[in-house]
Amino acid sequence: MAGSLNKVTLIGNLGRDPEIRTTGEGKEIANLSLATTDIWKDRVTGEKKEKTEWHRVVIFNEGLVSVVKNYVKKGSKLYIEGSLQTRKWNDSSGVEKYTTEIVLQNFNSQLILLDSKNSTSSSLQDSGHSEYKHSKPSFDHSDLDDEIPF
């Protein structure tokens, strides 16, 4: 059994277009602002209530950044898996600042586009290499009926 686990899974909508930045080494990084909303009915008033939580998502994986650049925009519904990381820095006044982010990099990160252009679910998983998947079959299954002997 593993000693610990750091895994975050979210389904939500982007609150703004992705921000793509380039590091000094020329590597692209995508920053996303993902909203998740809890909806419930108030027991006393019967009124519908909701609470939206905003999550910072940072993508370092080259393949995932490419998908974000080409297919993701404000309002996109995404499924993401990553790890939770907190970074610390000093602002211009020397005050320590902290931020907690969901980070997608290297292995065990996943990004699924839940509302692609063709109304089919598309996904990109990073398991050592980038691979873009479509849920449509790669061949037509209707041709198989002609070969069944009964």
UniProtKB/Swiss-Prot annotation:
Keyword Ribonucleoprotein: no
SUPFAM superfamilies (UniProt xref): Nucleic acid-binding proteins (SSF50249)
Sequence ranges assigned to domain SSB in this UniProt record: 5-111
DNA-binding region: 54-60
Residues covered by region (Disordered): 119-150
GO molecular function (one): single-stranded DNA binding
Superkingdom: Bacteria
Keyword DNA repair in annotation: yes
InterPro entries: NA-bd_OB-fold (IPR012340), Primosome_PriB/ssb (IPR000424), ssDNA-bd (IPR011344)
Motif Important for interaction with partner proteins per UniProt: ranges: 145-150
Function: Plays an important role in DNA replication, recombination and repair. Binds to ssDNA and to an array of partner proteins to recruit them to their sites of action during DNA metabolism.
Known partners and oligomeric status: Homotetramer.
NCBIfam families the record matches: PRK06642.1, ssb
Protein name: Single-stranded DNA-binding protein
Source organism (scientific name): Rickettsia bellii (strain RML369-C)
Gene that produces this protein: ssb
